[in-house]
From Swiss-Prot:
Coiled coil, from the record: none
Gene: hscB
Subunit architecture: Interacts with HscA and stimulates its ATPase activity. Interacts with IscU.
Keywords associated with the record: Chaperone
Higher taxonomy: Bacteria, Pseudomonadati, Pseudomonadota, Gammaproteobacteria, Enterobacterales
Native species: Buchnera aphidicola subsp. Acyrthosiphon pisum (strain APS)
Protein name, as recorded: Co-chaperone protein HscB
Family annotation (Gene3D superfamilies): DnaJ domain, HscB, C-terminal domain
Length: 174
């Protein structure tokens, strides 16, 4: 089942998130397993599967990155998050310095000014990647979208590593 069809949305990358949520809750009310407790086991099984499909579809379309990968899949491109970065060596070489900045932050006990600066750099890159992905989807340049998704994954990963390392640092000083 196509998730765009399931939630009665046009099949395009940019979606109306409010409409997605409204349609999700309508479907949940219609197919919630608790509403079918007195039905046959086979009917309960069908309803449970439909409810799982609704939840999975909602999570997929609500999340920017998951929606991008799903939309690519619908258009004939198989994308695996695990291998995307390996195919973009030039990008990795260019932005590996962000990991060096992270190491410097750790060595300097997470200097607040440096921390804020690095967070801003990463956040700006994430926003830029998302805007580029939206633009490239509009132009149906799917191979470019895949490349930019790999970059977005890199920035999201370093953002998570920064957050994790900073939390470790905070737990050690408290």
């Amino acid at each position: 089942m196509n998730y765009f069809t399931l939630f009665d949305l046009p099949r395009k990358f940019n979606i109306d998130k409010k409409l997605l949520s409204q349609n999700f809750y309508k479907l949940q009310l219609k197919f919630h397993p608790d509403l079918f407790i007195n039905d046959s086991e086979s009917k309960k099984k069908i309803i449970l599967e439909k409810s799982i499909q609704i939840n999975k579809g909602y999570k997929t379309l609500k999340n920017f990155l998951n929606r991008a990968i799903y939309f690519l899949c619908l258009n004939g491109y198989e994308v695996k998050k695990e291998t995307l970065l390996l195919k973009n060596n030039d990008f990795l070489i260019r932005y590996f310095s962000l990991y060096e900045q992270l190491d410097n932050l750790k060595e300097n006990n997470f200097n607040k000014k440096e921390l804020n600066n690095l967070e801003q750099i990463i956040q700006k890159k994430i926003i830029y990647c998302k805007k580029k992905i939206e633009l490239e989807f509009e132009k149906t340049r799917y191979k470019k979208v895949i490349k930019i998704i790999s970059e977005l994954l890199f920035f999201e990963k370093i953002k998570d590593v920064l957050k994790k390392e900073y939390n470790i640092y905070l737990s050690q000083i408290n």
